[in-house]
């Protein structure tokens, strides 16, 4: 689910923390990718023209395999070395969120039964998409045959991605879940595994600049995330992004905020959930269950060509000519290796407050200018009234 409203806070207060780039700008980078999130995207997006998921002759879904194969090839074509990270057992504190998701699925299943229009049916079918253990195992097999490393996290994949980035094993964590920032990844990449056809730039969020711009410690940022709403507990009812940021700046900790609300001094519309486990949620972000980065050895190797063809073509029904062509791209990309980047020879100094304020003002001005220009576009040759 991620953290509700965090994007809006970043856009409003620290736009300079986000850099929008083309995929080619990450040449030479190793990246840890949230596999479960990626597989979910592929199962929803990789479909036939009629909107139906890709499937083998035996009826097995293959959208996830096509997504992994071709989106990974695109990364390798652009000099990126990906490592996929798979979810382990969810923490007990997440059971409430998982129960809510199950309830939503049951409601969607009922709506699907009642749907008449084909478009309505497809909409509900997409909402019912779920990554199964079988999907995960097939994805792992494909990655092994492609010669690419993957890590099985003991718990949350985003936390493990962040740990690999903190340990210097990879440059960044890649996920659509904003709560990855609460696990203290130095950099978060969003939209990395999106389709090229979407023409969506990759968003690179710099955690150091983000915290500096918000003037929050990592502990306060985590408290902000919990207050906005995360997978581990409900949020404070009636408190939105603007109010949450104001409260954390004024009161510094969730303990103080809860005391302030329950003392009767605050807005009586705000309601702290009963037995709110915010301390336990905070601890899951500060000390997640992960394999230490120093213990992980990531290796990229030659693809097993014939075994890969047997799996993808003979077993799953993909076109052999296209798969072999993809294998050649894979071999070429992996032989290139991770070349040195010019910025690797320099240490970038963090911005001071004045520089950060100027960068944020420039980012806001650019955004406002684009919106104003967009609003003034009219039909050519027709005078304005």
UniProtKB/Swiss-Prot annotation:
It is an enzyme of class 3 (hydrolase). Binds 2 magnesium ions per subunit. They probably participate in the reaction catalyzed by the enzyme. May bind an additional third magnesium ion after substrate binding. Mg(2+) 2 binds at residues 177, 179, 231. Residues 1-105 are annotated as: N-domain. One of its GO terms (biological process) is base-excision repair. The keyword Nucleus applies. Keywords: DNA damage, DNA repair, DNA replication, Endonuclease, Exonuclease, Hydrolase, Magnesium, Metal-binding, Mitochondrion, Nuclease, Nucleus, Phosphoprotein. It is found in: Nucleus, Nucleolus; Nucleus, Nucleoplasm; Mitochondrion. Residues 120-251 are annotated as: I-domain. Structure-specific nuclease with 5'-flap endonuclease and 5'-3' exonuclease activities involved in DNA replication and repair. During DNA replication, cleaves the 5'-overhanging flap structure that is generated by displacement synthesis when DNA polymerase encounters the 5'-end of a downstream Okazaki fragment. It enters the flap from the 5'-end and then tracks to cleave the flap base, leaving a nick for ligation. Also involved in the long patch base excision repair (LP-BER) pathway, by cleaving within the apurinic/apyrimidinic (AP) site-terminated flap. Interacts with PCNA. Three molecules of FEN1 bind to one PCNA trimer with each molecule binding to one PCNA monomer. PCNA stimulates the nuclease activity without altering cleavage specificity. This is Flap endonuclease 1. It comes from Lachancea thermotolerans (strain ATCC 56472 / CBS 6340 / NRRL Y-8284) (Yeast). The lineage of its organism: Eukaryota, Fungi, Dikarya, Ascomycota, Saccharomycotina.
């Amino acid at each position: 689910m991620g953290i509700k409203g965090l994007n809006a806070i970043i856009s409003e207060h620290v736009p300079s923390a986000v850099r929008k780039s083309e995929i080619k700008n990450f040449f030479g980078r190793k990246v840890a990718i949230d596999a479960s999130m990626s597989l979910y995207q592929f199962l929803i997006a990789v479909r036939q023209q009629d909107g139906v998921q890709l499937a083998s002759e035996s009826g097995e879904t293959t959208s996830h395999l096509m997504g992994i194969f071709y989106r990974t090839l695109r990364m390798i074509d652009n000099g990126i070395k990906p490592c996929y990270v798979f979810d382990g057992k969810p923490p007990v504190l997440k059971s409430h969120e998982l129960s809510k998701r199950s309830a939503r699925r049951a409601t969607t299943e009922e709506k699907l039964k009642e749907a008449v229009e084909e478009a309505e049916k497809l909409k509900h079918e997409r909402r019912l998409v779920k990554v199964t253990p079988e999907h995960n195992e097939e994805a792992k097999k494909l990655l092994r045959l492609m010669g690419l490393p993957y890590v099985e996290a003991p718990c949350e994949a985003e936390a493990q991605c962040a740990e690999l980035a903190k340990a210097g094993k990879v440059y960044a964590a890649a996920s659509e879940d904003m709560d990855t920032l609460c696990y203290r990844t130095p950099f978060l990449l969003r939209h990395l595994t999106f389709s090229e056809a979407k023409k969506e730039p990759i968003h690179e969020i710099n955690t150091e600049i983000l915290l500096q711009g918000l003037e929050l410690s990592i502990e306060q940022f985590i408290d902000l995330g919990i207050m906005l709403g995360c997978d581990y507990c409900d949020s404070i009812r009636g408190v939105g992004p603007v109010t949450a940021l104001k409260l954390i700046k004024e009161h510094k900790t969730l303990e103080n905020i809860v005391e302030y609300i329950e003392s009767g001094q605050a807005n009586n519309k705000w309601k702290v959930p009963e037995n709110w486990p915010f301390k336990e949620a905070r601890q899951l972000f500060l000390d997640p269950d992960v394999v230490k980065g120093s213990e992980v050895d990531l290796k990229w190797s030659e693809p097993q060509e014939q075994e890969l063809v047997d799996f993808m073509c003979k077993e799953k029904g993909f076109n052999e000519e296209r798969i072999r062509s993809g294998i050649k791209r894979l071999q070429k990309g992996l032989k290139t290796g991770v070349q040195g980047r010019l910025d690797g020879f320099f240490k970038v100094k963090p911005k001071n407050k004045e520089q950060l304020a100027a960068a944020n003002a420039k980012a806001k001005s650019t955004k406002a200018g684009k919106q104003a220009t967009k609003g003034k576009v009219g039909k050519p040759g027709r005078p304005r009234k």
